[in-house]
Amino acid sequence: MPELLKQRVETCYQQAETFFKRPFPRPEVSFKLRGQKAGVAHLHENLLRFNLQLYRENQEDFLRQTVAHEVAHLVAHQLFGDRIQAHGEEWQLIMRGVYELPPNRCHNYEVQRRVATRYIYRCPCPQGEFAFTAQRHKLVRQGRRYLCKRCRETLVYSGETRVE
């Protein structure tokens, strides 16, 4: 686990403890997050998940803003309970008052779109070409059948793929 991120989580907790004059339990930290989200706070599990790729590509802002953003969710939940809005006034108070950061809801990191392979299936219809995802293609290989809505014939794998 990146040590700087771990240290930043700890620093955020120390700032919150100084500000609120009370201790907070430390969360488990995971890097099992992919896609567009930079971070997620699981309130009831006391768990923070971070996107390692976005961290590596945006380290400075990620450490300053994203880590504080997610820690603020856990601190707000531990202080105010379940009945608060995710980015409501309690969370904003923590972002502004404790961390002296703008309470931004979303990041503006550039997210690389994943390359996806499509498997081409056909039927006898004109323009009867269908691009299946890897998951749907696997289901066909396991015996599932898909029918064309126009001609009601079974779609057949053409042996072709394309990358999108």
UniProtKB/Swiss-Prot annotation:
Binds 1 zinc ion. The keyword Zinc applies. It is found in: Cytoplasm. One of its GO terms (cellular component) is cytoplasm. Zn(2+) binds at residues 69, 73. It comes from the Bacteria. Keywords: Cytoplasm, Metal-binding, Zinc. Residues 14-156 form the SprT-like domain. GO terms for biological process: response to stress. Its main location: cytoplasm. GO terms for molecular function: zinc ion binding. Its cofactor is Zn(2+). The active site is at 70. HAMAP family: SprT (MF_00746). NCBIfam families: PRK04860.1. Belongs to the SprT family. This is Protein SprT. It comes from Pseudomonas putida (strain W619).
